[in-house]
UniProtKB/Swiss-Prot annotation:
Pathway: Amino-acid degradation; L-arginine degradation via ADI pathway; carbamoyl phosphate from L-arginine: step 1/2. The keyword Cell inner membrane does not apply. The keyword Nucleotide-binding does not apply. The lineage of its organism: Bacteria, Pseudomonadati, Pseudomonadota, Alphaproteobacteria, Hyphomicrobiales. It is an enzyme of class 3 (hydrolase). It comes from the Bacteria. Transmembrane segments: none annotated. This is Arginine deiminase 1. Pfam families: ADI (PF02274). The gene is arcA1. GO terms for biological process: arginine catabolic process to ornithine; arginine deiminase pathway. It is found in: Cytoplasm.
Length: 409
């Protein structure tokens, strides 16, 4: 049975989920990348090499790395799992009733590895076999048009689900272009053999309902230990979602405090982890221009039903987090360089590091000023190339979904 649960941001990382660059990224163009919520086209071959290097460096430190294409492929061998995904992805509301009826038999018979590649990489009219209404669709649309859009942001596994102590959320995401990612996570957690028998709760989000204004993404969510959860509320995560997650955690006794961090809404600070991440139990790297503007609200449980009270915090975020963790003061490493360099390095994910254990982080090599400051503070910085992977606006923290992380001492 697989061990799961994330009990801190910097405890020993045991198991993590990633998604390598693949077909979805080969299909990015200057004309479609923004519709697919990817900032730029990437040199896929080089991005694959750099991602493989990232995986190897984690494995060298004893981390078990699970890859989403492989997990999904194994999951889709199960007929019930395949039906679960296709019922929701190959549906009239997604691709039209006639196209869905034509494609469903073809996809039901498809090899699971190929099906997994298409579910992540998308299906264009040109991919369809002859006789599947292909000629009619090709005459009406361009052959490169997608009947099932690719989801290239699967590269950033932090967002569609997040493990919080002994359970997980399957996150209703802010932009429609990313919501298919969550369906894949739901299928893996429900049906993959290594998760099917594991003991864990799904705190929230495992539903086909319309979540309306309740959206959440994992880049905003940090279980920092001792039953405390830090949640950014900026561009992508809303108070409507935070309240529901808090209630579920409090009802189960899984958390004692949820700290909501109200952030300015900006593309450069779309998630909390783009401006603030932990490097050690009491060490954080941050982009002060944004963090200094964050206002905090603490949620505390009132009863066994998960009802809670909300208290506005009058102190700066760093003081609130330090008090919650029981430390006198957080040691901070700000984005390095002068004003121009700091803004560039934050944009290039200089503060988006992932800890493999206390005091050891993975960072992009290009953020030389910030990495130097981290090393001077006693943090071991393992670097990976960021010239291609970073074009999607996410670093090591964004690209990883911890499945099992130990608490800190």
């Amino acid at each position: 049975m697989r061990t799961v649960g994330v009990h801190s941001e910097v405890g020993k990382l045991r198991t993590v989920m990633v998604c390598r660059p693949s077909l979805a990224h080969q299909r990015l163009t200057p004309g479609n990348c923004h519709d697919l919520l990817f900032d730029d086209v990437i040199w896929v071959h080089e991005a694959q090499k750099d991602h493989y290097d990232f995986v190897l460096k984690m494995e060298e430190r004893g981390v078990e790395v699970l890859e989403l294409h492989d997990l999904l492929s194994d999951t889709l061998i199960d007929a019930e799992a395949r039906k679960f995904v296709l019922d929701r992805r190959v549906a009239p509301n997604v691709m039209g009733s006639q196209i869905a009826e034509l494609m469903r038999p073809w996809m039901e018979e498809m090899d699971s590895r190929r099906l997994a590649a298409f579910l992540i990489g998308g299906i264009s009219i040109a991919d369809l076999p002859e006789g599947q209404g292909k000629a009619l669709m090709a005459s009406a649309f361009h052959s490169t048009q997608f009947v099932l859009p690719p989801i290239p942001n699967t590269l950033f596994q932090r967002d569609p689900s997040c493990w919080i102590y002994n359970g997980v959320t399957c996150n209703p995401m802010f932009w429609p272009a990313r919501r298919a990612e969550t369906l894949i996570q739901r299928a893996v957690y429900k049906f993959h053999p290594s998760f099917k028998g594991a003991a864990f709760d799904i705190w929230w989000g495992d539903s086909d309902e319309q979540f309306a204004n309740a959206t959440m993404e994992g880049g905003d969510v940090m279980p920092i230990g001792d039953g405390i959860l830090l949640v950014g509320m900026g561009e992508r995560t809303t108070y409507q979602a935070v309240g529901q997650v808090a209630k579920a955690l409090f009802k189960a006794g899984a958390a004692t405090r949820v700290i909501g961090c109200l952030m300015p809404k900006s593309r450069a600070a779309m998630h909390l982890d783009t401006v603030f991440t932990f490097c050690d139990r009491d060490v954080v790297t941050l982009f002060a221009d944004v963090v200094d503007q964050i206002r905090c609200y603490s949620l505390f449980p009132l009863d066994d039903e998960g009802n809670f009270e909300v208290r506005q915090e009058d102190r700066p975020m760093l003081e609130v987090v330090a008090e919650a963790l029981g430390v006198d003061k957080l040691r901070t490493i700000a984005t390095g360089g002068n004003t121009y360099e700091a803004e560039r390095e934050q944009w290039d994910d200089g503060n988006n590091v992932v800890a493999l254990e206390p005091g050891v982080v993975v960072a992009y090599d290009r953020n030389t000023y910030t990495n130097t400051l981290l090393r001077k503070a006693g943090i071991e910085v393992i670097t990976i190339r960021g010239s291609e992977l970073g074009r999607g606006r996410g670093g090591g923290h964004c690209m990883t979904c911890p499945i099992w992380r130990e608490p800190t001492d």
